[in-house]
Amino acid sequence: RVGLYSKRGRSRIEAARSALRDAGFHGQSDADLRAARTFAMAEPDGSDARKAADELDFYAASGARDFLFHAEEHELSPAELADMTEALGLRVLGLELTHSDAASLYRQRFPDDPAMADLRRWDAIEAEHPDIFRHMCQFWCVSSGV
């Protein structure tokens, strides 16, 4: 099982991070983290900082610190994941879908792929629906030789 953050899916979080950094928050102490969350909640609906409050992790200190002030995070597109799995000789078995519309969107667009395991096709879906892997892109793979 592999889980990675999606570039498109995390764009709203990156915007929130940037807004909080610009406001002077760094999340290095509990007090700074609480102040950053208070600031975000006081911002107008729809603002970049306020969008952080749409995430469940926002409401727990460890989760908020991780998603808002993570020291180093690598984000990839499903197409980049496809390149990586192919280069490593891996075959994708399937994805763990958390977005309620993900499976129906894929099946409507690609009815010939009942396994829904083509990362390049998922990239096309995500291009149209950037929040589909908002939390994480998780998938199962095996060696191509198996």
PLM regions and their residue ranges:
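Conserved class I S-adenosyl-L-methionine
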Residues: R1-R50
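Rossmann-like AdoMet/SAM-dependent catalytic core
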Residues: L33-V146
